[in-house]
Amino acid sequence: VRIAVAGGGAAGFFGAISAATHDSSAEIVLFEATHKPLHKVRISGGGRCNVTHHCFDPVELAKGYPRGYQELLGPFHRFQPKDTIAWFEKQGVRLKTEEDGRIFPVTDQSSTVVDCLLNAAKALRVQVRLGARVKSIQAAVPAEDAPQFEIELQDGMRQPFDRVLLATGSSPHGHRLAQALGHTIVPCVPSLFTFKVSDSRLEGLAGISFEKVKLTLTDKNKNRLEQTGDLLITHWGLSGPAVLKLSAWGARMLQQCGYQAELAVNLLPDFSAEKLYQDLLTYKEQNGKKRVHKEPVFPVPGRYWSRIAQYVGIAQEAIWANITNDAMNALVLELTRGRFAVSGKGIFKEEFVTCGGVSLKEVDFKTMQSKISPGLYFAGEILDIDGITGGFNFQSAWTTGWIAGESMASRE
C-alpha cells in the first residue's frame, strides 16, 4: 500500500506515524512544502509546546472546541489526552501538568517534541520529503488494485498513491487541493486573539491580572456572548483565558462586526451589586477616616481599585466619611459592569489558530475518510475544527491524525 501525507505539521506527522505503526509494510511518503517541518509545534506555547490538556473525560474535553465538539466526541473515546501522554512517554518524552491543566514536556523545550516526532517517523521508515509542495491531487477511477490518486509536485514530478492524507493546516493551498477533490471549504477567520482596548482605566496597568472574571461581549446587532476566567491587562488592551475563550467562541461574530464590540466586565461575579453596595456602606461606617484610594475593599488589585476610584471622580485624598451614595454606586458599577469598547484584535503569541476549513459534514469521523472521495483522509487544522487555548488544538491534531493513520493502514 502506498500512502501519501500532504503536510508536515503535528497532524501530518502523527498520521504518518500511526499508519506506519498499524501497517509496517505500507510505503508512506510525507510531503512538506517548506524546509521547516513541525514549525507550529516548534513555536507554540512560547517555544515550550503545550502538547495537550489535562482532561481525561471525552465529553468534557469536547467542550473545549467551538467548532467540532459534536464530531470529536467519538474520536476522543478512541484517542484522548491519556493516549497522547502514553505515546510520548513510551517514546521517552516525559510530560508535566501545570496548574491550569496545560501539559508540557518536562524539558520546557518544544524541540523535545519535534525531535521525538522526527525520530519516530524515521524509525518507522516514513519517507519525509522537505521542500516538496504538492501541486495537485488527481483522483483516478480505480481499476482492481490500481492506485487511485496521482500526486503532482511543484517540480512536475508525478507519483501514484492508494491513499492520501491531507493535513495541510490552515494553508489556503491545502483548501484548494480539498476543493479540487469535491470538498466544501467553510471560510476561514482568525480565532484565539486578544482584544485591543484603548481606555484611561487601563493605561499604565499592563501586567495586572484578575481571577475568575465574567465577561459579556455584545456586538452592534445585540448578539451576546459570555465567558468566565482570568483576565489580564496588556499594553494594548485585554487578554487572558477569558478573553481568548470569547475570541474563539465569537470568532465569526467578531469578524462580521469588524472586531468592534462592547465588553462588559464583572470583576466580582460571585456577589450581587446590592450586596457590594451594602458592604461599602458598612465599610464606610466603620472606616470613615480611611482614604478611599489607600486599599481596596474587595479582592481586586490595589492599583486598579485606585484607578476606578479616580475614574468615578473620587479625589486622591478623599476619606470614606465624605463619599456620597452616588460615588459608591458608581464604584459598584465599575466593579460589576465596567464597560469597555473593543476596537480591534491583537495577536496571541502562544498559539495561532483559524476557524474554518473542510466542512465537517463531508468527513466520516469514525475513519477521518472523505465521504466524497474514497481513499482521501483529513486530519488537523485543515478541518473546520478549532479549540480554545491550552493544548486543545494539538490534541485534535493527534486524535484525528492517529485515527486517519489507523484507518488508512487497515482499509482493505
Residue ranges and their predicted role:
Residues V1-A11:
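Beta1/beta-strand and adjacent pyrophosphate-binding region of the FAD-binding site
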Residues L72-K82, E99-N119, R129, A167-G169, ...:
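Short beta-strand to alpha-helix junction loop
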Residues A4, A20-G46:
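Glycine-rich FAD pyrophosphate-binding loop
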Residues R163, A167-L181, I385-E412:
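A conserved FAD-binding loop/helix module that cradles the flavin
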Residues L130-P147:
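A conserved short coil-to-beta-strand element within the FAD-binding core of flavoproteins
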Residues T21, K36, D57-V59, H77, ...:
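Residue-level recognition of phosphate/Mg2+-coordinating polar/acidic sites
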Residues A4-A6, F31, V134, R158-S171, ...:
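Short hydrophobic core segments
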Residues H39-L72:
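N-terminal glycine-rich dinucleotide-binding loop that anchors FAD/FMN and/or NAD(P) in oxidoreductases
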